[in-house]
A protein has these predicted regions:
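Function-determining surface determinants
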Residues: 1-290
Length: 290
């Protein structure tokens, strides 16, 4: 029930301190996430249900008997933190970088945790994406808004992970540039979640859907010259063309070749081990926010 309500309840140990955390999903677009979060510092490894009051507990779960709450997965990871600060024009930018390495375990299933979280402490959000893009140029970083809780739920129930982010409603009075941005964000966010889920389970249909979303995004970028000058999206289109040039023929051949379909997950992992996909995703986000 917590998963359906987009809520995660966690107990964490940090040294000798236990921390009870409640998280609820806020806005999430194309790998960039805003989450509501409450922390309580406790003396022992036991939920304090009194902390889960109306100030933080979702109304959708008001009838849930909190005494029945039981853990369904656990995470074991080490976090390393660093603060990065620099000047951007006349403004100061401060970002907290957290590297998490470990695993999430649900029953007999487990998945590796290897996450770099960048949190803007001070400055313009555009600076955060600039830093992420610089890192992604040298490291195989893949923007993804899946939380550790979602990873645990997915191990417990593989069908719990939603590959399509919520679509924004377009109205007749929506300006052309607003409609363009909404569609582009949806296609980009969906492609990222499809890539993550295909990496996880290797289901062929997800790879086909990933390609289709990228092809739709490429069509969108090339079709609205009046709303978006083509020169501004040239580098983005070239990067997307390179991705499509490699993957469209592979997927087309794989539709009629079982051997190629079986080889595709390993090829895709190879793609994710390079910088191309992550850098394209981040640069697309930067372009849409510009």
């Amino acid at each position: 029930e917590l998963a359906r309500a987009k809520v995660a309840l966690r107990m964490r140990r940090d040294g000798e301190q236990y921390i009870q955390t409640l998280k609820s999903r806020g806005q999430s677009v194309a790998g960039l996430s805003e989450r509501n979060e409450w922390d309580w510092y406790l003396e022992k490894n036991k939920l304090d249900l009194k902390k889960l009051d109306d100030k933080c507990w979702p109304a959708a779960l008001k009838d849930l008997d909190k005494k029945q709450l039981k853990p369904i997965f656990s995470t074991d990871f080490v976090r390393q933190r660093a603060e990065i600060a620099w000047g951007r024009g006349k403004a100061r930018v401060v970002v907290e970088a957290a590297l998490d390495l470990g695993k999430v375990v649900a029953g007999d299933n487990q998945e590796e945790i290897c996450e770099l979280e960048l949190e803007l402490r001070q400055g313009d959000a555009a600076a955060l994406l600039e830093l992420a893009a610089e890192l992604a140029a040298d490291l195989p970083l893949m923007p993804c808004d899946i939380s550790k809780a979602e990873r645990g739920y997915r191990l417990f129930d593989p069908n719990s992970y939603e590959v399509d982010p919520p679509a924004q409603k377009l109205l007749a009075e929506t300006p052309l540039d607003g409609a363009f941005a909404a569609i582009a964000w949806y296609l980009l966010g969906s492609s990222q979640r499809l890539a993550e889920q295909y990496r996880f389970n290797g289901h062929w249909r997800l790879l086909e859907d990933w390609l289709q979303h990228l092809q739709d995004l490429r069509t969108l970028l090339g079709s609205l010259g009046q709303a978006v000058p083509r020169a501004s999206s040239r580098e983005l289109r070239e990067a997307l063309d390179a991705l499509l040039a490699d993957w469209a023929p592979r997927i087309e051949r794989g539709r009629d070749d079982e051997t190629l379909r079986q080889q595709a997950p390993q090829l895709f992992r190879g793609e994710l081990d390079e910088t191309r996909w992550g850098l394209f995703s981040l640069n697309a986000s930067r372009w849409l926010l510009a």
